[in-house]
Amino acid sequence: RANSHSNLELFTTLSHEGFPGHLYQTVFFGRTQPADIRYLITSGGYVEGWATYVESYGYQYAASLLTDKAASDLTALMWKNRCINLCIYSLLDTGIHYQGWNQTAALRFLQVFGIRDTKIASEIYQYIVETPCNYLKYYLGYLNFLDLKKKQQEKSGSSFDVREFHRKV
């Protein structure tokens, strides 16, 4: 399975961009017949948070289909790695745009997490400088969905229905 990593990437990208991600989200929204103004106003954290949240289900589902325990564990690890990257880039974004980090400070921060190649670190820095708050939409939005789910689980107890939760959010 030389291309199994690329298959996983395709599968989880489709989870994020297609169904149950943005495609589902957009079609569902359109079927609610919202006021026209709602098409002009959007919340990036909600939109990307939902897509990242359901992407996590894509990884979980992919892992559950694998009969090889090592491959299943690797798939779960890849989701954790994606979360860590989103978190690191979100923290870096906050450091640059809120705390005023220059490139040297940002590179030092990335080195703590093992990103030592200065060319790669510089590219990450430049991308975040040029797209402020981009990663925050994905990661904080995702964390907000996890918080909503946890609160609903606590409120509902044993009657919690994940499908109903997804329908409401």
What are these regions, as identified by a protein language model?
Residues 1-169:
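Long, His/Glu/Asp-enriched segments that create or flank divalent metal/ion-associated functional microenvironments
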